[in-house]
Amino acid sequence: FFSLIPSLIGGLVSAIK
């Protein structure tokens, strides 16, 4: 579960950038 959190955050940051 905790592995999914950084993945989602990374995806959002990548989408924003």
Swiss-Prot record:
<comment type="function">
    <text>Antimicrobial peptide with low to moderate activity against most of clinically relevant Gram-positive and Gram-negative microbial pathogens (E.coli (DSM 787); MIC=200 ug/mL, K.pneumoniae (ATCC BAA 1705); MIC&gt;40 ug/mL,0 A.baumannii (DSM 30008); MIC=100 ug/mL, S.aureus (ATCC 43300); MIC=25 ug/mL, S.epidermidis (DSM 28319); MIC=100 ug/mL, E.faecalis (MF 06036); MIC=100 ug/mL, E.faecium (NCTC 12201); MIC=50 ug/mL, C.difficile (DSM 27147); MIC=50 ug/mL, C.difficile (ATCC BAA 1382); MIC=50 ug/mL, and P.aeruginosa (DSM 50071); MIC&gt;400 ug/mL).</text>
</comment>
<comment type="similarity">
    <text>Belongs to the non-disulfide-bridged peptide (NDBP) superfamily. Short antimicrobial peptide (group 4) family.</text>
</comment>
<keyword id="KW-0964">Secreted</keyword>
<keyword id="KW-0027">Amidation</keyword>
<dbReference type="GO" id="GO:0005576">
    <property type="term" value="C:extracellular region"/>
</dbReference>
<feature type="modified residue" description="Lysine amide">
    <location>
        <position position="17"/>
    </location>
</feature>
<protein>
    <recommendedName>
        <fullName>Peptide TtAP-3</fullName>
    </recommendedName>
</protein>
